[in-house]
Design a protein with these regions (language model features):
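Hydrophobic membrane-insertion alpha-helices, especially the h-region
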Residues: 9-32
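Alpha-helical transmembrane signal-anchor/signal-peptide segments
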Residues: 33-52
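N-terminal beta-strand/beta-hairpin edge segment
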Residues: 48-146
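Short helix-loop boundary/capping segments
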Residues: 161-207
Length: 269
């Protein structure tokens, strides 16, 4: 009699478990795109927003907006819409991004979760990642909204992998940002120059990555080096005016950093 009585109870438990599992699967399968927007807002501390989102977490689109953070009035939205698609490759999640205005080709990002670790990999983009208007940076607030830059920012990578294991960071590969034909409302010069910022992993299990700043061309000469380790950036550099451009760049040099004679000291961290 106990065995017969136990069977209905077991069946009820299995049915309940099945109903709960089905409900959870249904919620996950049809999770609205707004949920992804909330996650992006939290992860970026309110600097990057997915607005006017439609579709689902797995396949959707939204407008990409940059802000100075919570309470900031500096807001700028890129033209067009950012589309995304989520797929799986073994235990990894692959995110494919498309944006006609700015991405040169579909961008693929691979996320590998694990116990006490995770890895984020930016897959190689032979033709470059994309190009964005430099005035978009003004939405980040100070000092960008003061500099009011114009020009183009191009990103490229041969492949980049960021990994965190039990709180320790490691970066392999490289990411290059080219700031082409920069101009600023703070200066009377039509062009400040073109610059390159490179982030390069140290490899061999190192917990820091090298950061470098160099000038490709132009009257404003920028140079510097630093290290990035997870959430912390340490950078030291300098800004100078090329011969003949000193008077036109004085105000800008004063804004960029502490003056030391003809140069301005750049310091972060």
């Amino acid at each position: 009699m106990r065995t017969v009585a136990a069977r209905p109870a077991r069946v009820r438990r299995l049915a309940l478990w099945g109903a709960v599992s089905g409900a959870l699967f249904g919620v996950a399968a049809f999770a609205p795109a707004a949920w992804l927007g909330a996650a992006v807002r939290a992860a970026s501390a309110g600097h990057l927003l997915l607005t006017d989102a439609s579709g689902s977490v797995w396949r959707g689109q939204a407008r990409l907006t940059l802000t100075g953070g919570a309470g900031s009035r500096d807001v700028l939205t890129l033209p067009g819409r950012l589309g995304w698609r989520v797929s799986f490759s073994g235990a990894a999640v692959v995110l494919t991004l498309e944006q006609p205005c700015c991405l040169a080709q579909p961008l693929r990002v691979r996320l590998e979760p694990g116990f006490g670790r995770w890895a984020l990999e930016l897959l190689p983009a032979p033709g470059g990642i994309g190009q964005w208007p430099a005035d978009w940076l003004a939405a980040l607030g100070t000092p960008w909204n003061t500099l009011q830059l114009s020009g183009a920012v191009r990103l490229a990578t041969p492949g980049l992998r960021l990994e965190q294991v039990q709180g320790r960071w490691r970066l392999d590969g490289a990411l290059t940002a080219d700031f082409d034909q920069m101009a600023s409302r703070v200066s009377t010069l039509p062009r400040l120059g073109s610059y390159r910022v490179t982030l390069r992993g140290s490899g061999a299990g190192a917990e820091t990555a090298a950061v470098s700043l160099s000038t490709s061309a132009g009257p404003l000469l920028l140079a510097g080096d630093g290290q990035w380790g997870g959430a912390r950036l340490r950078f030291r550099g300098e800004a100078r005016a090329a011969e003949g451009s000193e008077a036109a760049l004085q105000n800008l040099l004063n804004l960029l950093g502490r003056r030391d004679g003809a140069r301005a000291i750049l310091s972060i961290g």
